[in-house]
Curated annotation (Swiss-Prot):
Protein name in UniProt: Large ribosomal subunit protein uL10
Function statement: Forms part of the ribosomal stalk, playing a central role in the interaction of the ribosome with GTP-bound translation factors.
Coiled coil: none
Pfam families: Ribosomal_L10
Source organism: Ruegeria sp. (strain TM1040) (Silicibacter sp.)
The family this protein is said to belong to: Belongs to the universal ribosomal protein uL10 family.
One term under GO cellular component: large ribosomal subunit
Entries under HAMAP family matching the protein: Ribosomal_uL10
Keyword rRNA-binding: yes
Quaternary structure note: Part of the ribosomal stalk of the 50S ribosomal subunit. The N-terminus interacts with L11 and the large rRNA to form the base of the stalk. The C-terminus forms an elongated spine to which L12 dimers bind in a sequential fashion forming a multimeric L10(L12)X complex.
GO MF terms held by the record: large ribosomal subunit rRNA binding; structural constituent of ribosome
UniProt gene name: rplJ
Amino acid sequence: MDRAQKEKVVEELGQIFESSGVVVVAHYTGLTVSEMQDLRARARDAGGSVRVAKNRLAKIALEGKPCESMSDLLTGMTVLTYSEDPVAAAKVAEDFAKENKKFEILGGAMGENALDRAGVEAVSKMPSREELIASIVGCIGAPASNIAGAIGAPASNIASILSTIEEKAEAA
């Protein structure tokens, strides 16, 4: 790799570190090509990406970034799993690590916050952005349906009372 290519890689990695909601660093020693392709496909499906980069270039790209403390994790054969959604990459990495013992999560960063192994696991258990939006919409919609039910209740109560009176009259 010549100097221009290295500078381009450093620039790309810098953009990744700035724009990603979460970056997970893991060792991937011993993974087969098909296993790496599976990891990439899972990350892509979740809206994330996977990148293998030289540790030295990644450390240069981290200089001056909010997640600079993550540079200590960049030793050995490392892979970066990242996404704009702060939860997606962590979930993909955790799920993949459970199935592949050769994939060892070291930690990562979420914005300015450095994450250790337990931190990545905790982030992976959080609801995704879509799940949070769905629950907020559900909370907003619930009062409206309750009001509609309360407005319709007197009419249904009257109908129920009238049908009971009618049944009693027919029985007598």
